[in-house]
Amino acid sequence: MNNRIDIYTDGACSGNPGPAGIGVVLLYKDHRKEISQFIGNATNNIAELTAIKKGLEAIKDSHKSTPIVVYTDSSYCHGLLTKDWTPKKNIELVQEIRQLTTQFNYLGFKKIKGHSDNQDNIRADKLATSAVENRRNE
């Protein structure tokens, strides 16, 4: 049994910018939590960043010292959060995420290939796209 929290994140938008949604899959031992949320009109990068932020915000205080790995298929997000890139856009959102990261003792980010055979990444993508589709159909 894995003793770390894995967070798979994805953002989707119809048009860029356009109606956008996020998908998050959190895994810890035998627990699973999924987040699917419409976030209004946004760019794909804002959706990807928002998914990461929501995933980190979903971690309970009692688990802040548990090792956490955030998986993203966004090179943009991975670069901003691991290579200390200076954001030219979305500055406030990036700052909020960087501030959130200071609350965790062991936090890492891993870049994964989008639309690969990783079932949790596929699920995060589905949650993000369904958030856009369901909101647009209301």
Where are the predicted features?
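RNase H-like nuclease fold core
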Residues: 1-46, 50, 57-59, 136
